[in-house]
Regions:
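Eukaryotic scaffold repeat domains enriched in small/polar residues
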Residues: 1-154
Length: 154
């Protein structure tokens, strides 16, 4: 029996057999988003296939991004000028990157590997590092998510 998650009118059945990647492709998705064509994008901690794309039925379509990410953390797909764009957040790179749906880099916000100065040692990636913050600093310091306002601003 498939487990049910959620509550109230937002309940879902978990289908652990939904995704059908090629044999040997390990999909350890840390974040998921869906484009306007109902394609499902999994931001994945597999360094050879960090962005894995499935159709709505779980059939593998493609992957891209090999070698571009260190610690994938968040994905959002938004419309810009009538086109889907893919925003990705890499926690350890300290960046937000915008791509076309087929993986062409359009924009990078932040400096790769440049953590803001908050008093935390730059090599401390522990989950308790936030306890060592002594002062505020500019963007970014271990970013973990992306949000957009109704007007489209990030």
């Amino acid at each position: 029996m498939e487990p049910i998650v959620g509550s109230g009118k937002y309940t879902y059945r978990v289908n652990e057999e939904w995704q059908r990647p090629p044999a040997g492709l390990d999909v350890r998705a840390c974040a998921v988003s869906v484009d306007s064509q109902d394609r499902v994008y999994c931001f994945n901690r597999n360094p050879e296939h960090p962005v894995v794309i499935f159709d709505r039925d779980g059939n593998f379509l493609s992957s891209w991004g090999a070698g571009l990410f260190t610690f994938p953390h968040a994905i959002r797909i938004v419309q810009e000028n009538g086109q889907d764009v893919v925003w990705l957040c890499d926690e350890h790179h300290q960046t937000f990157q915008k791509f076309t749906t087929d993986g062409r880099l359009l924009q990078t916000i932040g400096e790769k590997g440049e953590r803001s100065d908050t008093g935390v040692p730059a090599d401390d990636f522990s989950s308790a590092a936030w306890k060592k913050v002594t002062h505020g600093g500019g963007p970014f310091n271990l970013p973990t998510d992306i949000a957009f306002a109704p007007d489209g601003s990030m």
